[in-house]
Amino acid sequence: MQQLQNVIEAAFERRADITPVNADTAIREAVSQVIALLDSGALRVAEKIDGQWVTHQWLKKAVLLSFRINDNQVIEGAESRFYDKVPMKFADYDEARFKKEGFRVVPPAAVRQGSFIARNTVLMPSYVNIGAYVDEGSMVDTWATVGSCAQIGKNVHLSGGVGIGGVLEPLQANPTIIEDNCFIGARSEIVEGVIVEEGSVISMGVYIGQSTKIYDRETGEVHYGRVPAGSVVVSGNLPSKDGSYSLYCAVIVKKVDAKTLSKTGINELLRTID
């Protein structure tokens, strides 16, 4: 694996000079191998190690290099044709392979090669970009988008129209992460490498980026870039110091543990916030 990483790192340093015409065999094979490993879930752009999320930047570099070495090509689709550098993940799947891998794909869901979809996942008409990882038992609902390199945990529900931000560039930026057993409400947007920690519930229409204040009304604490585990979050506003205006924020209205979350309906949690 280290040899593979070394090839990617060296090629990335001279990426400006690499084209589909002059890319050598070693680079092509290395990039193809990485994309295949991402596609199978053997590698992932980010993973939790000793309780901390670690981003493997060299894998992002491999994805970016794939755009340098590949030309656009005609891609066949269900009702149309497309023209892009990245083939669709399921282009060569037959019924046996779908059954073996154990997930459902509802047309016209679009999933790019180099993303991983785990068993017992349901993809409604949605979009999953290259480098993304969607773990077991999750639902990507209608018109939801999982951006490049985003990490979606086990038993996550991404409701209709949810946007999970992607990140390939700038290179040092970390991917957006939704940990296990989270619920993201309809039309919410989680972007810019924000981490929603395990067991959290995000209400409908909540927008969270790195600069969004995440206000805990019980403690008065303000978080940035991280929703603490077990949070129930709704959209709100915080007043300015002089009270002349207010600015949007996300509000943690309560905390729930895994036991409460498993026994209580999502709607009930969001209705009883007073």
Curated annotation (Swiss-Prot):
Keyword presence, Cytoplasm: yes
Primary location group: cytoplasm
SUPFAM superfamilies listed in its UniProt record: Trimeric LpxA-like enzymes
Pfam families xrefs: Hexapep_2, THDPS_N_2
GO cellular component term of the entry, any: cytoplasm
The UniProt record lists the keyword Nucleotide-binding: no
Top-level EC class: transferase
PROSITE patterns: HEXAPEP_TRANSFERASES
Catalytic activity of the protein: (S)-2,3,4,5-tetrahydrodipicolinate + succinyl-CoA + H2O = (S)-2-succinylamino-6-oxoheptanedioate + CoA
EC number: 2.3.1.117
Pathway the protein contributes to: Amino-acid biosynthesis; L-lysine biosynthesis via DAP pathway; LL-2,6-diaminopimelate from (S)-tetrahydrodipicolinate (succinylase route): step 1/3
GO biological process, one term: diaminopimelate biosynthetic process
Record key words, sorted: Acyltransferase, Amino-acid biosynthesis, Cytoplasm, Diaminopimelate biosynthesis, Lysine biosynthesis, Repeat, Transferase
Cell compartment(s), UniProt: Cytoplasm
Molecular function in Gene Ontology: 2,3,4,5-tetrahydropyridine-2,6-dicarboxylate N-succinyltransferase activity; nucleotidyltransferase activity
Family: Belongs to the transferase hexapeptide repeat family.
Protein name: 2,3,4,5-tetrahydropyridine-2,6-dicarboxylate N-succinyltransferase
Organism: Erwinia tasmaniensis (strain DSM 17950 / CFBP 7177 / CIP 109463 / NCPPB 4357 / Et1/99)
